[in-house]
Amino acid sequence: MKTSLCLMFLLLISSLGFSQTYEIGGFVGGSNFIGDVGSTKFVNPNKLAFGGLFKWNRSPRHAFRASVIYSTLSAVDELSSDPRRKLRGYSFKMDVLEASIGLEFNFLDFDLHAATPMSTPYLYTGISMVNHPNFYFTTTNLVSEKTRSNAYGIPIILGFKTTLSRFIILAFE
């Protein structure tokens, strides 16, 4: 998968109806394309990414997690530091939708039922799928195939979360 959704800023809102065993929330961050078109910088968010998240907290140390992220990916060779890419002049813009399921592991106990403030670093991994349009470059143009495909990946996310109040959790990934 040639996309990178990075520097995610998550705002997770615990659900009151489930005694904080389940969490629902949203997040916003940045995205950028990593590939053979555009910038050669690995972390260089240039478009907005946003999505939703659901978690089932099985214990103070782990949770099952599902998320959906939407973003527009774009790349422009003229903005690259590579003179060959600048000379070539390719560019593209496309909308992508990513879905992910997996396991989140807390390095410290993160008990949502505790009355005291909690904080912990965490690790998330699982499987993700991105739906994207298919296209190819000719020597002068970007040509759409008018079809879409799925790409699969294994996300590895390191984050930190803390309780802001009894029902609000703030997390950074």
Describe these PLM feature segments.
Residues 20, 44-48, 95-99, 119, ...:
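Residues that define the transmembrane beta-barrel architecture of outer-membrane proteins
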Residues 118-173:
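Outer-membrane beta-barrel transmembrane domain signature
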Residues 18-57, 134:
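Short glycine/proline- and aromatic-enriched beta-strand/turn motifs that initiate or cap beta-hairpins
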Residues 22, 61-64, 111, 166-170:
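Repeated loop/turn-to-beta-strand initiation elements of outer-membrane beta-barrel proteins
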Residues 26, 52-56, 101-105, 125-129, ...:
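Residues on the lipid-exposed face of transmembrane beta-strands in outer-membrane beta-barrel proteins
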Residues 62-138:
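Gram-negative (and chloroplast) outer-membrane scaffold detector with strong preference
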Residues 34-40, 84-92, 141-146:
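Extracellular loop and loop/strand-boundary signature of outer-membrane beta-barrel proteins
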